[in-house]
Amino acid sequence: MIKEKLNLNSNLFLAPLAGVTDIPFRIICGELGAGLCFTEMISAKALYYDDKKTKKLLDTDPRENNTSVQIFGHEPEIIAYATRFLTENYNFKSIDINMGCPAPKIFKNGDGSALMGDLNLAEDVIRACKNNTDLPVSVKFRLGIDENSMNYMQLGQICERLKVDYITLHARTRKMFYSGEADWSHIKRLVENVDIPVFGNGDCFTKEDIRKNMEYSNCDGVLLARGAMQNPFIFSDDENKNKEEVIDTIKKHMQLKLEFYEEKRAILEMRKHIQWYLKGFRNSNKVKNEINQLTDLNEIFKILDEFKNE
């Protein structure tokens, strides 16, 4: 079981999310109970060309002890270089290969889910990563490019043969992006047909979603993306936190942001998180709208404290 192999406290993982899974958010999710937290998705080619902005995304903090990295790319020699670079220069728990990203720019370049259109190349990419690290390696992929080319089972079996440590299946095709419903029957089928740990991904927004889907599919864990982004308390024993706890977490998150970014950027980036944190609370729309107009930290904290004490 990958949870024991990596010495983790949970089989609920935080997925890589561009513009979201920075150090402050990873610290928050880790403290709330996430077993593993991913950096934002990293371009292997950008590492090869020594791109400073990309390398900045690899920064970690001593308060993190459960951080992993996900890379994307389609050239085995570039993947091999990036894997060696990450292994030799950082202290990540594991390396994940993205073969599921549906974004047009990624797909057009032959990366992400485009690799599901060439399983021979996908195999070469996985082998290049495995052969250049002693860290656990995982692969994340989708059902296939579209409903007529669902080859996730073949890719899962390739991963098994190459002794990948675990795999994650997002139960949608590339064509679906994030529309429609994730079909967990495919995750169940994959679990039944490969002898390596399988994590499920797709449409887990509550603890009940997680419980139901894990029980149905018998998967080994869940990778949480939008569900965690919108409610990081999903990692804790009780996802239904009271208003006081949520606002205290917002303020802690803001203070963490201020450690890593200048104040203006921290405030702007926290706006989206505040929208998610306060979702569902009575009268929260008024508070969220007010905060969206503010650029002064003390004013923001004042409004949050007033809302907490209502």
Question: What residue spans do the PLM features occupy?
Answer:
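Flavin-dependent oxidoreductase catalytic cores
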Residues: 1-310
